[in-house]
């Protein structure tokens, strides 16, 4: 499935707009990860533990969005937007992704009437 932040895909015609698709993931802060991150912050550098958690959360949200687009018989998602939101006094983070599921010409999927 093609996924892009742009509203169109160059060289491909959009036959049908299937609708909005979203994916969300919520991750909680781990106390041990927080301790390691604070040590990293003191000595400088990047926190691999946090980066890995964010990448996993992002990938899960995108996969959820792709699954929803597949159920709508889409073969691409355009106009994708990715957001990160911290809530619960910094104890939780939500990764959300949204876009428009579409059926591109020359791809798999069945045009809906």
Curated annotation (Swiss-Prot):
Belongs to the UPF0145 family. It comes from the Bacteria. Coiled coil: none annotated. This is UPF0145 protein SynWH7803_1684. HAMAP family: UPF0145. It comes from Synechococcus sp. (strain WH7803).
């Amino acid at each position: 499935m093609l996924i892009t932040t742009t509203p169109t895909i160059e060289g491909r015609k959009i036959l049908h707009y299937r609708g909005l698709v979203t994916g969300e993931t919520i991750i909680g802060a781990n106390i041990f990860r927080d301790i390691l991150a604070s040590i990293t912050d003191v000595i400088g550098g990047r926190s691999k533990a946090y980066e890995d958690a964010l990448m996993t959360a992002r990938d899960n949200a995108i996969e959820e969005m792709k699954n929803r687009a597949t159920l709508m018989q889409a073969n691409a998602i355009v106009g994708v937007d990715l957001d990160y939101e911290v809530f619960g006094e910094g104890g939780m983070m939500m990764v959300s992704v949204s876009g428009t599921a579409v059926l591109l010409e020359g791809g798999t999927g069945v045009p809906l009437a």
